[in-house]
């Protein structure tokens, strides 16, 4: 074991963490690579902001490395690439120099173009606005606002480095545009327009991941993710509240998950299709490889259609969330085997229609607006949904796949 090998292991872990991988996946991948390099004495402490690792050389001396992990920027293609590289390493058909070179290539992997990111912001806002109950006109307006937000988000980071300030200004922009469309009678329902546009910046994934890390006893990481999601939602709520309080007095009607339109099969089908399209948008924003877009779209459609169908058959929202999340988690696991990539590629995108980020944001917004009863209701809904989704994922993760017996008869 040399210092170079340990640094390679840490670099693989750093790429995974900074790309949005969970702690357990990062630890497992590092251990797989370590065993493939023929040493069993790696001791590593992994958190979402750093990796501390110690190993022994052949002469018995210890080497220690500390690796700082930058802010998470979700890139599922990088996670998939590191996963594929780790499989090649375990097969022992690659040199140390080749591993180091490939990790450098993965770390500097190119992003989707400015055009495709704008397409993603537009489709995400329009698709999810329609999925949660807007009219076609309002969903188009949400898409236009999403497009403008995309231009803002893709350019503002060249000027500002504060995520809090970027989010506040972005939410002010969304609220201003939404209210202007309503003022000129181009739209009818401000709530669904704003919620659709907000979906592009809502922290639904960190919120659920925080609960997942809690469930795996990674309390420090869970607290960090939860506080990050809370701060993002506060920033969003502050921006919208400022616009609503100082400039406009448009009444926003609370939209609860239990009140979605499930009366018509055609309506549920069309809204689920738009949820699938919105899922594709997040596949672009999360840098999923293009060959997985169809899978993500289909799973996004299925997750929302299952939820709407189950909600139409019974009144327990959490049961609908659990069954939908459980089925999608199983489907993601099956696809991961067939496509030879991590399940997170499908799971993180296809569950997006079910994520509670919007409810979390609304709980803070209504608290700021002095409507405590509504705020508590949305806070309760967001935490229950997050726990329900996390439980469904954890259950599927701990289900052992059946062993397939090979026919040994000649």
What residues fall within each predicted segment?
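Soluble N-terminal domains of membrane-associated systems
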Residues: 1-101, 105-107
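Alpha-helical membrane-inserting segments
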Residues: 127-132, 148-157, 173, 177-185, ...
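Hydrophobic alpha-helical transmembrane segments
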Residues: 115-119, 139-144, 165-169, 226, ...
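Structural signature of hydrophobic alpha-helical transmembrane segments
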Residues: 129-145, 189-203, 258-274, 312-326, ...
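Membrane-interface helix termini and inter-helical loops of multi-pass transporters
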Residues: 184-190, 247-265, 366-378
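Core alpha-helical transmembrane segments of integral membrane proteins
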Residues: 111-208, 284-286, 290-295
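C-terminal transmembrane helix-loop-helix hairpin of multi-pass membrane proteins
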Residues: 18, 193-201, 209-234, 308-410
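Short juxtamembrane and helix-loop transition motifs at transmembrane-helix boundaries
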Residues: 97-109, 122-134, 149-161, 250-263, ...
């Amino acid at each position: 074991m040399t210092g170079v090998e340990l640094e390679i292991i840490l670099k693989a872990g750093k790429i995974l963490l900074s790309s949005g991988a969970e702690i357990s996946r990062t630890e497992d991948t590092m251990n797989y690579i370590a065993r493939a390099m023929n040493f069993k004495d790696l001791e590593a402490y992994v958190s979402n902001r750093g990796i501390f690792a110690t190993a022994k050389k052949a002469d018995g001396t210890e080497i220690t490395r500390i690796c700082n992990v930058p802010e998470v920027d979700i890139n599922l293609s990088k996670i998939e690439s590191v996963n594929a590289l780790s499989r090649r390493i375990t097969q022992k058909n690659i040199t140390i120099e080749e591993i180091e070179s490939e990790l450098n290539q993965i770390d500097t992997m190119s992003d989707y173009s400015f055009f495709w990111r704008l397409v993603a912001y537009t489709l995400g806002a329009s698709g999810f606005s329609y999925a949660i109950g807007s009219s076609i006109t309002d969903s188009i307006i949400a898409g236009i606002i999403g497009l403008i937000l995309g231009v803002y988000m893709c350019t503002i980071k060249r000027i500002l480095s504060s995520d809090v300030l970027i989010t506040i200004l972005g939410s002010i922009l969304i609220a201003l545009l939404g209210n202007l469309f309503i003022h000129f009678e181009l739209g009818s329902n401000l709530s669904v327009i704003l919620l659709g546009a907000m979906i592009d910046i809502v922290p639904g994934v960190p919120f659920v991941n925080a609960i997942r890390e809690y469930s795996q006893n990674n309390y420090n990481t869970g607290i960090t993710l939860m506080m990050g999601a809370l701060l993002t939602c506060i920033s969003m709520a502050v921006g919208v509240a400022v616009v609503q309080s100082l400039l406009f007095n448009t009444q926003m009607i609370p939209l609860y998950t239990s009140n979605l339109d499930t009366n018509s099969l055609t309506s549920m089908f069309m809204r689920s299709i738009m949820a699938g399209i919105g899922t594709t948008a997040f596949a672009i924003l999360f840098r999923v490889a293009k060959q997985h877009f169809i899978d993500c779209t289909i799973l996004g459609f299925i997750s929302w259609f299952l939820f709407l169908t189950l909600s139409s058959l019974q009144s327990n929202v959490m049961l609908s969330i659990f069954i939908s999340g459980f089925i999608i988690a199983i489907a993601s696991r099956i696809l991961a085997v067939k496509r030879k990539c991590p399940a997170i590629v499908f799971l993180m995108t296809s569950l997006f229609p079910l994520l509670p980020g919007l409810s979390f944001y609304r709980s803070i917004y209504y608290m700021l607006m002095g409507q405590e009863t509504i705020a508590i209701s949305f806070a309760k809904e967001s935490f229950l949904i997050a726990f329900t989704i996390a439980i469904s994922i954890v259950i599927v993760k701990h289900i052992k796949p059946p062993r397939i017996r090979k026919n040994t008869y000649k």
